[in-house]
């Protein structure tokens, strides 16, 4: 074989070998059904989840009302009141006197927050409960759900006082309401023990307390009562257009809030402050 023929034969054999190798290991080709290698499928944990809605707050079992009850246009209070005007309908004013026991005042505030019941506190200023509970009471005062009025500084019988001593009793309590809560108690004064006459009424009016507030029924709990007795008084007096007195002096009433709400529900009663009735909801008593 000539050298030239040998080289041609060798080149042809090499080309055939390379062709065979290529056939055994074909190059990969793109498959349109496969995802790109740079974009692997997202795992379930990487999927975007929708936000979980916040749960709706549940109402307290004591809940009775939201805000003031529907009321007619207010009419100015007389110089002496014992009950609410007839045209207010199924509305009662629950008023709470004294404040001997700070824990009872605190419990009344929880009752107000849980039930929505609107309360008028007649404050006897010498008791520490009115400063002890300031931080908890202040938002309720500012919202108008709780009203503060004057029940004197030391709870004396007003009919036994001179004009100067009576004015001092009112002024000291008024100063507490102003300094601690930024409000006035005027024009509502409740005389301790119900002791009043034309002289006390006129003297109170000289310092802005032009309406003496008496009552049309009481829980009777200025002193310590059993639960059965107090509940009986509540059943007797929680009626439409009544101004009813309770006292923040002993814890008995704090065990009966559920039963008091039951009475109000059974009688379709809502509670209003004196401001709601005589000035209209939203009355500003800041000074």
Q: Where does each model-flagged region fall?
A:
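N-terminal pre-catalytic segment of deacetylase/amide-hydrolase enzymes
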Residues: 2-94, 101-107, 114, 135-137, ...
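Residues that form or flank phosphate/diphosphate-binding pockets in enzymes
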Residues: 103, 131-132, 199, 252-255
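Metal-dependent polysaccharide deacetylase catalytic core of the NodB/CE4 family, i.e.
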Residues: 91-92, 113-234, 240-245
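Catalytic grooves of carbohydrate-active enzymes
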Residues: 239-275
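Histidine/acidic-residue-rich catalytic or RNA/ligand-binding cores of hydrolases
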Residues: 224-225, 256-258, 285
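Active-site metal-binding loops of divalent metal-dependent hydrolases
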Residues: 96-99, 152, 248
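Non-transmembrane alpha-helical segments in soluble domains
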Residues: 7, 109, 174, 258-261
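Short amphipathic alpha-helical segments
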Residues: 107-108, 134, 201-202, 257-258
């Amino acid at each position: 074989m000539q050298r030239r023929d040998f080289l041609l034969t060798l080149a042809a054999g090499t080309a055939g070998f390379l062709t065979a190798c290529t056939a055994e290991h074909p190059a990969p080709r793109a498959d349109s059904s496969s995802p790109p290698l740079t974009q692997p499928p997202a795992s379930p944990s990487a999927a975007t989840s929708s936000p979980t809605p916040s749960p709706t707050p549940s109402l307290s079992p004591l809940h009775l009302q939201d805000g003031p009850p529907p009321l007619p246009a207010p009419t100015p209070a007389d110089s002496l009141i014992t009950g609410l005007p007839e045209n207010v309908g199924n509305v009662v004013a629950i008023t709470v006197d004294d404040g001997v026991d700070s824990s009872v005042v605190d419990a009344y505030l929880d009752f107000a927050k849980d039930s929505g019941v609107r309360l008028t506190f007649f404050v006897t200023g010498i008791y520490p409960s009115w400063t002890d509970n300031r931080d908890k009471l202040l938002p309720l005062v500012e919202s108008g759900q709780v009203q503060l009025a004057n029940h004197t500084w030391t709870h004396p019988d007003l009919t036994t006082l001179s004009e100067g001593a009576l004015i001092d009793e009112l002024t000291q309590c008024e100063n507490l309401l102003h300094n601690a809560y930024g409000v006035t108690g005027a024009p509502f004064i409740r005389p301790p023990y119900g002791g009043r006459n034309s002289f006390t009424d006129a003297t109170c009016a000289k310092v802005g307390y032009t309406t003496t507030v008496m009552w049309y029924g009481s829980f009777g709990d200025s002193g310590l009562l059993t639960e059965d007795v107090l509940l009986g008084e509540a059943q007797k007096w929680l009626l439409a257009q009544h101004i009813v007195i309770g006292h923040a002096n002993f814890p008995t009433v704090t065990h009966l809030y559920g039963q008091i709400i039951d009475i109000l529900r059974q009688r379709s009663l809502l509670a209003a402050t004196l401001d709601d009735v005589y000035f209209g909801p939203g009355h500003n008593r800041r000074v």
